[in-house]
A protein has these predicted regions:
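Short, Lys/Arg-enriched N-terminal segments with co-localized hydrophobic residues
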Residues: 2-16
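C-terminal and late-domain segments of enzyme folds
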Residues: 18-50, 60-62, 66-76, 162, ...
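Structural motif
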Residues: 21, 112-116, 147, 183-184
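A residue-level signal for conserved active-site and pocket-lining positions in enzyme catalytic cores
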Residues: 55, 113, 150, 184, ...
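Portal/gating segments that form or line small-molecule/metal binding sites
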Residues: 62-128
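Alpha-helix C-terminal capping/helix-to-coil transition sites in glycosyltransferase folds
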Residues: 108-109, 142, 179
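Catalytic nucleophile loop
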Residues: 114-117, 140-159
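Catalytic-core regions built around general acid/base machinery
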Residues: 130-143
Length: 273
């Protein structure tokens, strides 16, 4: 099958970039980050991160962690992720960026940047507020490893427009890190008309919402990342990892399903696949 990808804007993909873009932190019925641990560990080893490497965590999507409102929720979020990174991977220098007075400086000195999931609108608003959008982009382009899940994957895209979240705040801009030239819809859920009929749900499906976006942004590509899948960008190439297919959508074209563990570098530059 020939699938031509056409992008609205051109992004030069730096071969130095190291990105791990994860759809979701936790699978139903599992402990926090359990499914992703092997991927995160291998990614960290691949990028020569040591136990004393400076890991900076961005918690701003976590507005209601453990039933606490922010900023207290940031502490709870940090503790939750820090526990996994210490117990599973042995990292000892893990700090949330909200503790730093000079947040841009903290990012510039980081050996690895992690952006957690939650509400994408709040995350983007705070990243713009503190000048982190440009700072993180600069570091990622320079080769500093970047790990994001859910909202943290959303912000690696040109905009936040394919988030699933409620707009609980108004960011200064919908523009995000622009590290990849396509949009990600994390937690992508296939339509289930039989379930909708059973529960008498008459609202839009995820596919309906994405079609709305594509109708207005006809030159863009949307990648639906299903649960327990991720995209790895390294050495100028991109791989789909995990146990499920990925769906690639573009206006006026039939959606394409891509098998797991497939090279999807074509999405980075508009080649044919």
């Amino acid at each position: 099958m020939i699938f031509l990808i056409i992008f609205a804007s051109t992004i030069i993909i730096e071969k130095t970039m190291r990105l791990l873009l994860i759809s979701n932190s936790t699978n139903f019925g599992e402990t926090y980050l359990a499914w992703a641990c092997n991927q995160i560990e291998f990614f960290c080893l691949q990028n020569n991160l040591k136990k004393d490497s400076r890991i900076v965590f961005v918690p701003f999507a976590g507005v209601n962690i453990a039933g606490k409102a922010y900023p207290e929720s940031y502490d709870a979020y940090e503790a939750r992720v820090q526990k996994v990174f210490f117990e599973k991977f042995g990292f000892e220098n893990f700090t949330s960026v909200h503790h730093f007075e000079d947040k841009v400086k903290a990012v510039k000195e980081a050996d690895c940047i992690i952006v957690g999931g939650g509400n994408t609108f709040h995350l983007v608003a705070e990243m713009h507020k503190y000048g982190l959008m440009d700072a993180i982009r600069e570091r990622a382009l320079a080769g500093v490893p970047y790990i994001g899940w859910s909202a943290g994957s959303n912000v690696a895209c040109p905009t936040l427009c394919t988030t699933n979240d409620m707009p609980i705040v108004q960011p200064a801009s919908f523009k995000t890190l622009n590290l990849v030239p396509f949009q990600i819809n994390p937690h992508y859920l296939d339509p289930h008309p039989e379930i909708d009929k059973m529960i008498k749900h008459g609202g839009e499906t995820r596919q309906d919402r994405i079609n709305e976006y594509l109708a207005v942004n006809q030159q863009m590509v949307v990648v639906g990342l299903r649960e327990a899948t991720s995209l790895w960008v390294t050495d100028g190439k991109m791989m789909l990892k995990g146990g499920k297919k990925m769906i690639v959508m573009q206006y006026g074209k039939e959606a394409v399903e891509i098998e797991p563990n497939t090279d999807v570098t074509f999405l980075l530059g508009g080649q044919q696949a």
